[in-house]
Amino acid sequence: MTNIVVVGLQWGDEGKGKVVDWLSNNADAVVRFQGGNNAGHTIVIQEKTYKLNLLPSSILHNNKLSIIGNGVVLDPYALMSEIDNLRINGININTQNLVISESCPLVLNIHKEADTLFEQLRQNTIGTTNKGIGPCYADKISRRALRVCDLFDKKDILYNKVNNLLNYHNLLRQNFNILPIEASKLVDELLDIAPKILPFVKPVWKVIHDLTQQNKTIIFEGAQGTFLDIDHGTYPFVTSSNTIAPQAFVGGGINLSHSSCVLGVIKAYTTRVGNGPFFTEQKNEIGKSMFERGNEIGTVSNRERRCGWFDAVLAKQAIILSGVSGLVLTKLDVLDQFSEIKICTQYKYDGVIYDYIPASSYVQNNLEPIYETVPGWKENTFGSVTYEDLPKNAISYIKKIEEILKVPVYLISTGPERNAMIIINDKFLK
């Protein structure tokens, strides 16, 4: 099997975790290449549900290497909590199956507090998870962040780095009349958590290079979705990292000569958590029905997801940005209840037709979707095991999506369980 990059083509929550878990059977390693514990993957194995935030989905498999790449911002306390919870549930996690990049910036409590403060300052809140992700990435870009490798430092060297970080954060806290953080206290906290993290730490770029030299198969696991990308998303309602496929090379530490298949994971309808434009949102019984049947609750935020019709304009743009080779269609069964189904094929604003998402947030907020209506099937697709099992109109719907997007559907997820997957085209597995 070739190396595979798995990305979400909407606003996250497309089902990437299940897809990566399924693919892990035929892979040697899985790399998380961006984001932090603000994203969540839900995986169901033999009716038992696992919720992952930082750990790659491969951690639930035996003899697979799980890698947290340098593009991830790492909350050491959240990571250890996640590891401890999995160990309680019988999942073996050790230095042989988990590797953490020495270059990962550290998410600290000061970042979470800053996240909350910045959200309060905004006129229009962006719906942050308050996990400290944005402020940590800001420290990284400003070259003051603490990184995992700093935990190897002697106490006096670490103190100087902490003091440099607090020069900024304590000034921020002063402006909000919040007590400053003592450098010595933060140093002690870091030295306390360090022995739990450091055994997993290696130069990930070298680990990945060695795997490629041995012709091992690597999956690069994206978090969130294309339109939460800091550059290409619906700004400012975005995350603080790049979420599209090219980020796998930067955030994983692999060079461009190692060609990869890009799988785009996409729901048969559209959802979004939090604030921001949503062009096909259904604030009616249709949206409510999608929400209830799809159990659309955020894994991390525990917030209700907004629901709407499939947006082919959004999907096509995401496919171009990531160079998607094939699609994984998820939650088709949520549409089983509808006699008619709509697909957005264009937008309209101020008399102008758009076949892409304009960058202007003002225009985005005023785009009107133009729909094409196709017949529904009113038959159960949940748990279908072959393509031929699907209702005729469900197959027509899938083919319509392929026709509009000009990319084939490789896989169809027919339920939350690991093996609830229909393979239409398996060439990427060879």
Curated annotation (Swiss-Prot):
Swiss-Prot/TrEMBL catalytic activity: IMP + L-aspartate + GTP = N(6)-(1,2-dicarboxyethyl)-AMP + GDP + phosphate + 2 H(+)
Q: Where in the cell is it found?
A: Cytoplasm
- Some GO term, biological process aspect, for this entry: which one? IMP metabolic process
Q: Which residues bind substrate?
A: 299-305
Q: Does this entry carry the keyword Acyltransferase?
A: no
Task: Relay the cofactor remark from the entry.
Answer: Binds 1 Mg(2+) ion per subunit.
Q: Where is the active site?
A: 13, 41
Keyword tags: Cytoplasm, GTP-binding, Ligase, Magnesium, Metal-binding, Nucleotide-binding, Purine biosynthesis
Q: What is its EC number?
A: 6.3.4.4
- Residues binding IMP are 13-16, 38-41, 129, 143, 224, 239, 303
Required co-factor(s) are: Mg(2+)
Please give the family membership noted in the entry.
Belongs to the adenylosuccinate synthetase family.
The record's annotation in NCBIfam families points to: PRK01117.1, purA
What interactions and quaternary structure are annotated?
A: Homodimer.
Q: What does this protein do?
A: Plays an important role in the de novo pathway of purine nucleotide biosynthesis. Catalyzes the first committed step in the biosynthesis of AMP from IMP.
> Which PANTHER family does the record match to this protein?
ADENYLOSUCCINATE SYNTHETASE
Q: What is this protein called?
A: Adenylosuccinate synthetase
Q: Which organism is it from?
A: Ehrlichia ruminantium (strain Welgevonden)
